[in-house]
Amino acid sequence: MENFKGLQKSLYIWTDSADLDKRVEQLKSATGGDVALENVHRLSFSSYANSSFDLIVIECAQLTDSYVKLLHMLKPSGKLHLVSFIGPAASLLQEIKLSGFINCREDSPDALTAEKPGYETGSSARLSFAKKNASAINVWKISGDDEELIDEEELLDEEDKQKPDPAGLRVCSTTGKRKACKNCSCGLAEELETEKQSQKATENAKSSCGNCYLGDAFRCSTCPYLGMPAFKPGEKVQLGDNLLKSDI
């Protein structure tokens, strides 16, 4: 009882009325404060306000359903003291811990002490580690003005925009490929041969003046590119079919 000195308001829960006055006087002498009385069988019908007592002393520990209520009745950091309890101390300490008490200990073979946490039941506190670093937030902040959008049209070259020549997509009806079969009768063999001759003539065509790519205004009268639009130097140009045939 010496550990309870200075506690101003206590509650003594009794089971046996014999020598009750003597036990109450001992508690008053140890704490130096006021002591209220309550019968253990009437505790469930009591209506004590929360945080009413600094100390609660119980003569019997058969209060499995009332430990939480006692926790509410105690002030923050208030103490619960059990004497003359029945059953194993370890089992009783476990029940008290599960009810929310801390610092549960066995003072003697027939006495236990526990404490209510230093805050009111149901209270909340701000956690320091939950604060966010402002600089870290700004790093990941995305603004619509900062977005660099890519123009889809810039991803395509002029060559990509040109539609393919349907004639160049023709395939052999037998092989299913743009390659004539051995006994081609659909005309694909002649078409491929014409393209081959045209390509060969284009590769052999050379400019003596070096101005053929500029257009008809700069070309000779016998220029193979006469009548064709201007083109870039080194650009591959296909000559017309009329230039691939002999004049004689």
UniProtKB/Swiss-Prot annotation:
[2Fe-2S] cluster binds at C172, C181, C184, C186. Residues 4-129 are annotated as: N-terminal SAM-like domain. A motif (Cx2C motif 1) lies at residues 209-212. Belongs to the anamorsin family. This is Anamorsin homolog. Component of the cytosolic iron-sulfur (Fe-S) protein assembly (CIA) machinery. Required for the maturation of extramitochondrial Fe-S proteins. Part of an electron transfer chain functioning in an early step of cytosolic Fe-S biogenesis, facilitating the de novo assembly of a [4Fe-4S] cluster on the cytosolic Fe-S scaffold complex. Electrons are transferred from NADPH via a FAD- and FMN-containing diflavin oxidoreductase. Residues 130-161 are annotated as: Linker. HAMAP family: Anamorsin. It is found in: Cytoplasm; Mitochondrion intermembrane space. GO terms for molecular function: 2 iron, 2 sulfur cluster binding; 4 iron, 4 sulfur cluster binding; electron transfer activity; metal ion binding. GO terms for cellular component: mitochondrial intermembrane space. One of its GO terms (biological process) is iron-sulfur cluster assembly. Its cofactor is [2Fe-2S] cluster; [4Fe-4S] cluster. Keywords: 2Fe-2S, 4Fe-4S, Cytoplasm, Iron, Iron-sulfur, Metal-binding, Mitochondrion. The C-terminal domain binds 2 Fe-S clusters but is otherwise mostly in an intrinsically disordered conformation. [4Fe-4S] cluster binds at C209, C212, C220, C223. Monomer. Residues 172-186 are annotated as: Fe-S binding site A. A motif (Cx2C motif 2) lies at residues 220-223. Its main location: cytoplasm. Residues 209-223 are annotated as: Fe-S binding site B.
